């Protein structure tokens, strides 16, 4: 992959998937660039966890929705999303018990457990994204180095042009999918 600059980390309290809308399209929760960098912004954020939604409502200037992934977003955004960022759990079910105690004891399981291989929610987001993205719109999802090849494949199978961005400094891997 290519190096990238990651200027923001997901917000504290972020659970499950976070979404938002920029300029006519969508971008995500705490990982979204600041509005000044984007010009006019219409921001939408969503989460299935009520505590995360309450936190977002206190901290996000924009629309905050409660619900499961795309089901939480207004239908009027379909096909208009320019940037979509999802903060989905990617820890495989069998490895959740190996996480540090502070994560296991203070985060809901839904914020940690990504399914058998850790990619269940990533696949759901990738499959749903093409219906919401505008042509040329991009989906961004963080994953692990080990899961990156399968995550890129999931984006490709969903019809997105996939690439991988890596930051050695932050030990972060982000799959980027662009709608043709």
Where are these regions (language model features)?
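Mobile active-site "lid"/loop adjacent to the S-adenosyl-L-methionine
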Residues: 88-120
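Short, solvent-exposed coil/turn segments
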Residues: 41, 74, 105, 136, ...
């Amino acid at each position: 992959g290519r190096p990238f600059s990651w200027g923001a980390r997901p917000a504290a309290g972020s659970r499950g998937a976070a979404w938002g809308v920029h300029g006519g399209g969508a971008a995500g929760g705490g990982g979204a660039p600041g509005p000044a960098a984007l010009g006019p912004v219409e921001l939408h954020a969503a989460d299935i966890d009520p505590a995360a939604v309450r936190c977002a409502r206190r901290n996000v200037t924009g629309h905050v929705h409660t619900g499961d992934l795309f089901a939480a977003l207004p239908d009027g955004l379909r096909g208009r999303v320019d940037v979509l960022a999802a903060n989905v759990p990617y820890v495989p079910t069998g490895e959740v018990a190996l996480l540090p105690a502070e994560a296991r004891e203070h985060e809901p399981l839904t914020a940690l457990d990504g399914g058998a291989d850790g990619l269940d929610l990533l696949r759901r987001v990738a499959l749903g994204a093409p219906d919401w993205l505008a042509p040329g719109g991009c989906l961004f999802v963080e994953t692990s180095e080990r899961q990156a090849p399968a995550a890129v494949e999931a984006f490709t199978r969903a019809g997105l042009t996939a690439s991988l961005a890596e930051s050695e400094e932050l030990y972060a891997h982000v799959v980027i999918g662009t709608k043709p």
